[in-house]
């Protein structure tokens, strides 16, 4: 897969996530959500419709990997929440990205500015 990225959520454990799956984890880092809310946020990000046939199998894969927890809200609606392992996978990915991007003080300042703006 061309979208694949490798992240390690624990020493010795390697997770292969697509960019789409990574984006789901990022969305769930805000708060637990049901599937259609995740779908809407992905559509906003991508600027195009996200097919149910793409979303739900990816959510199921993330649940199977232990990065997302699935719970039943009612008979028809499931809620998805980021697990501690999923959160750690996001931190590991950010750490790796920052280690490659931050090559001098100016770039470090740029990232500090981004982080400050997000607060």
Give the role of each language-model region.
Residues 75-94:
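Basic, amphipathic "hinge/linker" alpha-helix immediately C-terminal to the N-terminal HTH DNA-binding motif
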């Amino acid at each position: 897969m061309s979208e694949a990225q490798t992240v390690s959520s624990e020493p010795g454990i390697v997770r292969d996530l697509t960019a789409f799956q990574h984006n789901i984890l990022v969305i769930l880092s805000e708060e637990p959500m049901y599937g259609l809310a995740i779908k809407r946020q992905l559509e906003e990000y991508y600027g195009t419709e996200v097919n149910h046939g793409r979303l739900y199998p990816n959510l199921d894969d993330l649940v199977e990997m232990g990065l997302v927890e699935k719970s039943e809200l009612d008979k028809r609606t499931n809620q998805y929440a980021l697990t501690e392992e999923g959160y750690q996978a996001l931190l590991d990915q950010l750490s790796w990205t920052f280690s490659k991007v931050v090559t001098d003080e100016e770039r470090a300042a740029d990232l500090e500015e981004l982080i400050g703006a997000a607060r």
